[in-house]
Curated annotation (Swiss-Prot):
One of its GO terms (biological process) is DNA repair. Part of the RFC clamp loader complex which loads the PCNA sliding clamp onto DNA. One of its GO terms (cellular component) is DNA replication factor C complex. It holds the Pfam family AAA_lid_RFC1. One of its GO terms (molecular function) is DNA binding. It comes from the Archaea. InterPro entries: AAA+_ATPase (IPR003593), ATPase_AAA_core (IPR003959), DNA_pol3_clamp-load_cplx_C (IPR008921), DNA_Rep/Repair_Clamp_Loader (IPR050238), P-loop_NTPase (IPR027417), Rep_factor-C_ssu_arc (IPR023748), Rep_factorC_C (IPR013748), RFC_lid (IPR047854). This is Replication factor C small subunit. Heteromultimer composed of small subunits (RfcS) and large subunits (RfcL). Belongs to the activator 1 small subunits family. RfcS subfamily.
Length: 322
């Protein structure tokens, strides 16, 4: 294998039993393989948790050697438009499946990026080729998929992977690549991954370019993530009434790590539960974080939103000490 190969590809599960986590889903997919038939499928869930990996492993097991000819992966949100996607489907569906197979599989990634009109066009395409093709539609949010498509599919919801799953995946790769992962290094990988195995593997590969001994410092440095402790320190300063100091800490984090506003908000959200705050204080702060998060997606100033959030930490801290 090439030295510079991307590890997420190199370690893509070949078989359904190699997929980590999602046992209930893989069990049912294996039963499709055994029966030699499957309905249209809708895979929904966050990025990097194994939706594509499951679809490819399913095709490999179903078709064996001929899987490449009987499986196509298309990006539904192809920027050239839904007509290009439909043309690709048409060309692929035109020829009969190879080998023993009764149907071909069309894997459509990012279907939730399609407008409702484009999804309606897709639905008609699904119907037209239903005799010779099965569709596996992948999306982050099933609520963004129109009802007529959802009702034609068996829906599988992929959740984020838990810490044990990430540890299993990372340990497997580290062993093969001759890396030593320190306990704090693994904790950092789990923190950075946020349930996304792709993110964990990419973080490991970047870290491996600078060290064979993977520590938390290496992970935070190579992924431009602030250490949870630094975020906690910033929040504690605000809670203790030292608003200007917490603001300086924010500056330091922005400069050191080049964090985006949404990165910091996400980290603040995760750190605040470690501060031993009363439930009613947490409730008030979570409410504010939700607000700031929404405003950022609407294009508000990152700097002002985060400072406003720190101001709320200060106000809650002051109310708490009364
Ligand atoms: N459950 C898993 N078990 C083992 N490896 C995994 C798992 N999930 C992800 N990976 C690794 O991460 C890579 C990316 O995963 P995959 O392409 O399946 O994500 P996805 O859920 O389809 O994401 P997206 O929504 O972004 O397309 C895989 O090639 C594999 O290396």
């Amino acid at each position: 294998m090439a030295e510079d190969e991307i590890w997420t590809e190199k370690y893509r599960p070949r078989r359904l039993e190699d997929v980590i986590g999602h046992q209930q889903i893989t069990r049912r997919l294996i039963s499709y393989v055994k029966s030699g038939n499957l309905p249209h499928l809708l895979f929904s869930g966050p990025p990097g948790v194994g939706k594509t990996a499951c679809a490819v492993a399913l095709a490999r097991e179903l078709y064996g050697e001929t899987w490449h000819s009987n499986f196509i992966e298309l990006n539904a949100s192809d920027e050239r438009g839904i007509d290009v996607v439909r043309n690709n489907i048409k060309n692929f569906a035109r020829t009969a499946p190879l080998g023993e197979a009764k149907f071909k599989i069309i894997f459509l990634d990012e279907a939730d990026a399609l407008t409702s009109d484009a999804q309606s066009a897709l639905r008609r395409t699904m119907e037209r080729y239903a005799a010779t093709c099965r569709f596996i539609i992948s999306c982050n949010y099933s609520s963004k998929i129109i009802e007529p498509i959802q009702s034609r599919c068996a829906v599988y919801r992929f959740g984020p992977l838990n810490a044990t799953d990430i540890t299993t995946g990372i340990t497997r790769i580290a062993k093969n690549e001759g890396l030593k992962i320190e306990k704090d290094g693994m904790d950092a990988l789990i923190y950075v991954a946020r349930g996304d195995m792709r993110r964990a593997i990419n973080a490991l590969q970047s870290a491996a370019t600078i060290a064979k001994d993977i520590t938390a410092d290496v992970i935070y440095q190579t992924t431009s993530t602030a250490k949870p402790k630094e975020i906690e320190d910033m929040l504690k300063l605000a809670l203790n009434g030292q608003f200007m100091d917490s603001r300086n800490k924010l500056d330091e984090l922005l400069i050191t790590y080049g964090l985006s506003g949404t990165d910091i908000i996400d980290q603040i959200y995760r750190s605040m539960f470690e501060l031993g705050l009363d439930e009613d204080v947490l409730v008030a702060l979570v409410d504010r974080i939700g607000e700031a998060d929404f405003r950022l997606t609407e294009g508000a100033s990152e700097r002002i939103q985060i400072e406003a959030l720190l101001a709320h930490f200060k106000m809650q801290g002051a109310a708490r000490s009364k």
